[in-house]
Design a protein with these regions (language model features):
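Glycine-rich phosphate/adenosyl-contacting loop at the front of the ribokinase-like
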Residues: 1-44
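Conserved phosphate-binding/catalytic region of the ribokinase-like
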Residues: 161, 189-291
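Acidic-glycine-rich active-site phosphate/pyrophosphate-binding loop
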Residues: 1-13, 56, 213-222
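Conserved phosphate/ATP/ADP-binding segment of small-molecule kinases
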Residues: 137, 142-145, 151-222
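Conserved phosphate-binding/catalytic loop of the ribokinase/pfkB sugar-kinase fold
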Residues: 70-73, 83-126
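A glycine-rich helix N-cap at a beta->alpha junction
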Residues: 61-76
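Hydrophobic beta-strand scaffold residues
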Residues: 43, 69, 146-147, 203
Length: 291
């Protein structure tokens, strides 16, 4: 992921305007919340958009997915991530954060968190230390379980001390891929999971085609992969978090929760984009319920 300014973002859009593309609401936490909503969990989303076309699309997509949008408004433009996918299914992002980074800690209140059971936050918010820390403080004050996706290895490297501090003080569940986990601990996947779980309640490290590992209380659970034909890996980690948090919220074991995440991740990488098509969800829900 590469952060870019508005001018560069528009230049990229002009460069690729003749390629096939789709336009959907996105963002790591947004993708995760969409997955949870599709699984039948009542959800809300806190964020900031602008009064522009992208902001309208974002809000309508949230509402259509039965997500309660708690959206503040500001200028200059709604943030956007341009996902560029290579023939071997890998992807990179040119991300213009726009009004998303205008969300301030002062705008968050305890009432926004009341009535919920779990708060999931993406590591990209670490751009504003005060915002991410206040959101976690309020979530804990409201009695919520908290989860954090580390987002990107470069985000971890640039904010290591701060991330380690908030994980140890406010976070119950950490999600990371191998690169992010190594950046966070300096250790390979399994050792990283155990190390991170010393700082929080549960650590999940996703290891791509090898599956994932989950650590808690000094114990490690290894989760095998599910066969899938990789087309686009965008959203794989986000949908894994959807499945895992669904399982956790419904009292499933860590192994079954991780398998739920694996099932969703395997499905989304067979599609273009970070969302699973509506027609796929009935079968996925049955698979997860049968765990």
């Amino acid at each position: 992921m590469q952060l870019v300014d508005l001018a560069f973002s528009e230049r990229v859009l002009r460069t690729v305007e003749n390629l096939d593309f789709s336009l959907v609401s996105g963002g790591s936490a947004s993708n995760t919340i969409h997955g949870l909503a599709k699984l039948g969990i009542e959800t809300s989303f806190i964020g900031k958009v602008s009064n522009d076309e992208f902001g309208s699309i974002f809000e309508k997509d949230m509402t259509a997915s039965s997500i309660h949008p708690i959206l503040f408004r500001d200028e200059p433009q709604t943030g956007r991530a341009i996902a560029l996918i290579s023939p071997d299914s890998e992807r990179t992002f040119a991300t213009y954060l726009g009004s998303a980074v205008k969300l301030s800690a002062d705008e968050l209140t305890l009432d926004l968190f009341k009535g919920h059971d779990l708060f999931h936050v993406e590591g990209y918010l670490v751009q504003d230390h005060n915002l991410i820390e206040r959101s976690l403080v309020l979530a804990k004050e409201a009695g919520l379980t908290t989860s954090l996706d580390l987002a990107s290895f470069n985000v971890v490297v640039e904010n290591l001390g701060f991330l380690q501090s908030i994980v140890s003080r406010y976070v119950d569940i950490v999600f990371a891929n191998e690169e992010e986990a190594r950046s966070f601990t300096g250790l390979p996947a399994e050792e990283s999971a155990l190390k991170i779980a010393e700082m929080c309640k549960i650590a999940v490290v996703k290891t791509g085609p090898k599956g994932s590992v989950v650590a808690t209380g000094g114990k490690l659970v290894r989760i095998p992969p599910v066969d899938a034909k990789r087309v686009d890996t965008t959203g794989a980690g986000d949908l894994y978090a959807s499945g895992f948090l669904y399982g956790y919220a419904n009292g499933l074991s860590l192994e079954k929760s991780a398998m739920a995440g694996t099932i969703l991740a395997a499905c989304v990488i067979e599609k273009i984009g970070a969302k699973i098509p509506d027609e796929c969800w009935p079968d996925l829900i049955e698979k997860i319920k049968s765990l």
